[in-house]
Amino acid sequence: METGLFWIVPAASVLALVLAWYFYRQMMQESEGTPLMIKIASHVRKGAMSYLKQQYKIVGMVFLALVILFSIMAYGFDLQNHWVPIAFLTGGFFSGLSGYLGMKTATYASARTANAARSSLNKGLQVAFRSGAVMGLVVVGLGLFDISFWYLLLDKCIPDDTMNPTAKLCIITTTMLTFGMGASTQALFARVGGGIYTKAADVGADLVGKVEAGIPEDDPRNPATIADNVGDNVGDVAGMGADLYESYCGSILATAALGAAAFIGTGNTEMQFKAVIAPMLIAAIGIVLSIIGIFAVRTKEDAGMKQLLNALGFGTNLSSVLIVIATFLILWVLGIQNWLYISMAVVVGLIVGIVIGRSTEYYTSQSYRPTQQLSESGKTGPATVIISGIGLGMISTTIPVIAVVAGIILSYWLASGFDFANIGMGLYGIGIAAVGMLSTLGITLATDAYGPIADNAGGNAEMSGLGAEVRKRTDALDSLGNTTAATGKGFAIGSAALTGLALLASYIEEIRIGLSRLGTEVLELPGGGSVNVHNATFTDFMFYYDVTLMNPKVLSGMFVGSMMAFLFCGLTMNAVGRAAAHMVEEVRRQFREIKGILTGEAEPDYARCVQISTKGAQREMIFPSLLAIAAPIITGLLFGVPGVIGLLIGGLSSGFVLAIFMANSGGAWDNAKKYVEEGNFGGKGSEVHKATVVGDTVGDPFKDTSGPSLNILIKLMSMVAIVMAGLTVSWSLF
């Protein structure tokens, strides 16, 4: 029966892709509106596709170099499974494909959303949200399809081990983890490159357009406005999609590997198989329930911000409640060991996700006191806005960190059967909590991708000169999108923390495989005693490698990992600064040299601004991304396994907190500006408004470049460590 249940996984992936195609066709049947609306949307679409084409060329070259390296390691030195190079490629391919399909949908949806808003608010919401659902369903559909494909392929190709029957599933799951590195590598380039692009355009448009020229946002007279709208798609759609594709696959694969490891050496292959497929089944049922939630989202015509939020919240909450019930049923039918408490670990993951989302909303939405106070600080100038925003971001880390810590302890405690010594099942519980948090990704990512679609729709309506009523509706949709985007960023960061911890535990399992490939049969433990490699527990490996806080190699790795988070942020912030400087100079040049732009008599050179952002992003994204890949390899060669574990712990702990701080500071600065633009503290054009625009400009790379990229840095370093475990075990200096 258990084998039959597995087929639910590929079936759910196909269902997600079919529904994504259905929503895409439904959106394409809507009218794009007036000729001017079509022209503007075409400019944005052309710019977005041009950027993506250039990005994939660079990513393709990086992938080619890495595939050659992995092939040498696998076929030349036998340091990896021979399937690794191909698995790595498929992970990157499907991650890139999900970003491409989601962005293509978003660029076609913006004008259609603006045009639908001419009819009614609900019609605009439906078009934007269903278009966002294409991204959500494509990500989960392709992710589960890739996982199903590799599981079935490796199950057929890897022979059974009669001497150690539980070894086969360990080899399968650790090999599958390597396609997660492909997804992580592609995601980092998408996030960093997209973030640099969108913020260079945004900062240039805001500083020169709003502050210097005094023209509104999305005004067609601003040369950077098309590049700004393109950036919303490449950063917030393609980048976010690749980020969450990686988290989704990574959490499922890491949990499956931990499930296999929990039963290593027991001979209980039946229970081991159940532990491996449980996260896949939870994700599969989550797809079905996400689809139900998507269909449940609708609102009334006279709805305000609260009703719009409630409409999206109802769909997401419905899916979450149903997945809780379904998880208990799945694990009960599956008959997995300790099924009741493992089901509770899934609930813990969902609750942690909700708490982080609500905390993010509280600290970043203009509906609440923290952001309103941030707006008020603009009375004394931009310096106090910056100071207050940094303080707000630091304070906002408290609730998410406490939530994640509670989630780790509770899920470990529940899954281990209230026995902290049962490390294998405890770590499996943490992985299951991460899967639970991401189980309804189909609808949570739909609400996230909705944001940039609504933002672009508002820009299209402004540039097309649609009526005040239409602009009011698109503003309502856009404002809702800013809140869902901020919540989505918090959700992505929280899921990265749990997934990163599960991947860290999976690294130990990959060390087992690496030692076996070297021919090491027995671990000689310090102080006497020995244990067979195949039967060694997590504690045995920690003891063997002396992974303690008194080991200087572990401490050195922790310091390097903590440094990596700050170094990476610094590099990406500076990259945005340099690219934005080029954009500012170009916008000033056009205002100066092209007569009649500000009076509306001449059209700006939009293409030139798009070109500047594209080139800047491509050039600046390479070094930070390659550094993230190189750090675990160099640390492993210098300090061995203890150093790599320290690196991953340091990167995870500092990266998680820093990511929350940056995302929430940036989100609060953005909405503080919007709160003033609603007419508070003097409204648009006032000194307070100018101060909050400066805050928003500083916050742009915080929330859309450096902060979100840290999620991927955390997971990519773990993925690289896992793939390079054989190299670390064989060739480390110490």
Which positions does each model-derived feature cover?
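Hydrophobic packing and interface segments
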Residues: 1-734
